[in-house]
Amino acid sequence: MNDIDVRRFVDINIKQHVETQISGTRDTLVLYTHEGTFGKISGNTTTNISDDEILASWAAASAIYPAQTFPDTNAYLSMYFQNAGARVVVIEGVDYTDLTADMLKSLDNKFILVAQCSAKANVELAYAALKKIATTRETDKDIYGVNEKIIFGRTMTATDTDVITNFASKYSKVYGAEMTMAAYLSGIDVYGVSTVNDYMYTAESIDEEVLTDELYETLSLNDINVDTYFAGNVRDLGGNLKNGADLTNSYVRIILHQTLTDRLLELLVTKIKNVDGVGKIYATISKELENYRSCGYLSTDKVWTDKTMTVTANGKQYTIIEEGTPLTNGYFVQVLPMSALTENDRAARKAPPIYVIIADQYGIRAITVNGEII
């Protein structure tokens, strides 16, 4: 009998398909510090952040940044990890006067959380510098969706009335107190079940602020977070960014942009076509949004109360969503037909326009009970 390999004629090799893994967490804080050597990241001489520069425990972080040599950085890292912070990257030798909006822009999109450690005497100056960077980013037309970041700062000025997007403020006498906010967000996994919750009332490991009702009212009106003793523990009161947006929801919205982008890029490389491709796009978006419903980010009891939304594409008007439509899934996806594409769109191989409306969760922060005694 001959010994010819049968694979010369019929060659079959069916393997188990392994799906691309897309992470539901963005759990790494980038901490710039005035201490250390410029050009070092987490103790390593490098300009790029790799897994080697990501510190995943207090033991690892304090070994590189001991209190004797790096007292300020150590204090910040201690606050982060004692409040269950997940992971951190430390970029050395960058004081508040050195940090720029371009530095943040150069960070990978997966690094959403940003803080800066300055000397104790410069806390308010650093706070002002961070607000300026956040304001610069807010007006940068190239920053939206996937490349947004949340910047954290600490102040002892309750009357800060500035309204700033993606800037989280904490009123505290405690050095590094803003790290509590970053630590909380770092623990959110959008692919979990009921893992997205309001930051308000979170118990934290930090010294409390003793507040008068008038002071709390001022902080609340100015969307400044504060830790005080409440309901048997030291807890955060506030839960918002400086523009009044919910801190948790804003963070998860950025992650949503990123994971949905990843899913659609994953779909694109399969070389989808025409009408069949449109169906796959719709299915991919809906499947990903289901994860955000499961984790608690999306609410299923909201209704589109605005006027009916319409758009005009390729000379024809299309209805996206009608007034009074309930968002029973927490989201509403509308994909326009192929006829909505212009000739130029077709030549560019574009998919038809897709509209996504989401209803984020509303965290209840106050309860009023009325009644009568008879």
Q: Which role does the model predict for each range below?
A:
Residues 1-49, 56, 233-374:
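Structured, hydrophobic secondary-structure cores that serve as assembly/anchoring elements
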